[in-house]
Amino acid sequence: MSNVFVIDTYILIDHLRGFEPAKFLIKKIRDEKITAYISSVTEAELFSGKDIKLENNRRNLKELISLFEKIILNNEIAQKSGEFRRNYNIETPDAIIAATAFHKHCKLLTKNKKDFQKIKEIEVEEPY
């Protein structure tokens, strides 16, 4: 496994839910054995969860997000995500996350491999 990834939202959700393989992966990121980015879309998706209303959950989420370099949607990512959405018929958030991996020249780490693997321009890997 390469050591530089864009991390998909579902992996972070797994971590927040206490799923051990996801917690182990986040520990590797925290220990700087893996370099990981998230898209600003991932942050938005995480903060849209119903459990985020609780202050403790919001604090845990902010701490988790602080482990990553957040990649903000820019013109290049926006245009590439539009191309991915058009060419591969995927949802806009997924297209933006895929375009972020393309922009950073790294693999996309996701549990949702079936939706992303059709995008020929990026490498997709399942974490567990």
Indicate where each model-derived feature is located.
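Alpha-helix capping/helix-boundary segments
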Residues: 11-12, 42, 77, 96-97, ...
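Generic structural signal for small/hydrophobic residues in well-ordered secondary structure
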Residues: 8-9, 46, 81, 101, ...
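Short, flexible helix/strand-to-coil boundary loops that buttress conserved ligand/catalytic motifs
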Residues: 16-17, 50, 85, 120, ...
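Nucleotide phosphate-binding site architecture
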Residues: 12-13, 44-47, 117, 125
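Short, well-structured N-terminal submotif of metal-dependent ribonuclease cores
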Residues: 1-38, 48-62
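Acidic, PIN/NYN-like endoribonuclease modules and their adjacent C-terminal/linker elements
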Residues: 1-2, 98, 103-128
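Active-site neighborhoods of divalent-metal-dependent phosphate/nucleic-acid chemistry enzymes
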Residues: 70-111
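Histidine- and aromatic-rich ligand-binding microenvironments
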Residues: 7-8, 14, 38-39, 90-91, ...
